[in-house]
Amino acid sequence: VPPDAARLPGPVPPARLSLAAQPLEDAPESVARGADEVFVAASVMKVHILAALALRVQGALGHRAREVTAQERAWAAAMIERSDNAAANALWQAAGGAAGVTAAGRLLGTARTRAAPDGRWGLSTTTAADQLALLRAVHGRGPRREVLAPWARQWVRHLMGRVVPGQRWGVTAAADPCAEAPGVPQGEVKNGWLPRTATGLWVISSVGRVTAAGRPWLLAVLSDGHTTRQEGVAAVERAARDAVRGLTDRAGRDCRQPGPRSGGAAGPAAGE
């Protein structure tokens, strides 16, 4: 963890925020702040649901391997690209409910993620460290790199790269403005936003992959306690930008201007 990690700006009290960021390639750079703190997952849990379904389909959870059905593909697209909750309800059941999602988590290395036992998947809890571990598994990196089959990893990433424009905020704010080809959405993302009934305060979280300084990065930013949705989105985006900037040499440099870029190949590029 770089020495300036503790000085990353925090959210407006009473909000909390945690983050974990790392290059996609197995490199030593990383940054974490409160990465083991527990947060309500909201719709970032939808990536976990899809990964759990994929494991079930590929036969990794003691079930016979089979093909993904056309209905499951349609639900998955709606759940990730548009954050459709009805589709998430259906896939939660298809993935085996809380028991199936929990079993998948053991394989994926998300030890501190707790699936809600009553079917209210958005109230499952997780940590930024677990979300980073899940992203690494989805991208075929780290000790769980072979848990998901190649087709499953590609499926999850493809859908996270197709999230509708109105939901492409969050960690994508850390991407270089010209890191991707013209007209191509920036990176892969899934966001969560949820006002808590008891307090009216917002859970705002974002996970995904972006390209910055010529390198792909995996980021997870979880937060809660925001008085407005807009305040939470701004805090998450600021934290994502500052975390990646602290890990690169691009501070103050606009990638649209001529000049040398950092080494490493850029890789290809989702609420309630």
Segments predicted by a language model, with ranges:
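A general structural signal for well-ordered alpha-helical segments in protein cores
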Residues: 47-50, 88, 236
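Active-site SXXK
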Residues: 38-64, 79, 219
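Short alpha-helical patches at coil-to-helix transitions and adjacent helical residues
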Residues: 44-47, 81, 85, 124-132
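Acidic/histidine-rich, surface-exposed loop or edge segments in extracytoplasmic proteins
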Residues: 29-34, 50-53, 81-85
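A short glycine/serine-rich beta->alpha loop
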Residues: 33-40, 117-120
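Conserved catalytic neighborhood of penicillin-recognizing serine enzymes
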Residues: 58-104, 127
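Penicillin-recognizing serine hydrolase domain
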Residues: 1-28, 93-272
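Short, structured coil/loop segments at alpha-helix boundaries
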Residues: 33, 62-72, 84, 145-157
